[in-house]
Amino acid sequence: MDRLWAPWRYAYVKAKKHKNCIFCRGLKSKSKNYVIYKTKYSISLLNIFPYNNGHVMISPVRHVKDFSLLKEAEIVDLFKTLNKVKKSLDKVLKPHGYNIGINISPDAGAGITGHLHLHIVPRWKGDTNFMPVLFNTKVISQSLGELCRKLQNELC
């Protein structure tokens, strides 16, 4: 079986887990949790342990763990938000492609299991370079704070 090797995420794996959910916390504080966009039914925030620059997580406001528990309005809003965030990433970062997905359960790769969320990960040709393999380092050329401000400005 192939494995995704992301050594820079080890800090997240080993970090003390908060009792309350990152998405629910994000609903209360915009800047502290890198929230870039909120709607009535969804919240979008930058992943602080990104697979790539611009890695955004989008979740329903309601704390549910499975897609099948969402109401139709939440599903529609989630995908409209995904489309809006993607367009914003297109303008701000100009990636060559994306990985977009949902991991449900730890066996499927979910790191946050209690609150459903989807990932949108911008990709560029050659972004799977040698740095993680040789130096246990992921090259992210922009600070989360700077990117957060740019995306907030683009989305609002």
Listing of model-derived features with the role each one plays in the protein:
Residues 47-51, 112, 122-123:
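Short glycine/proline-enriched loop/turn "hinge" motifs that connect secondary-structure elements
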Residues 72-95, 145-152:
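Long, well-ordered alpha-helical scaffolding segments within enzyme catalytic domains
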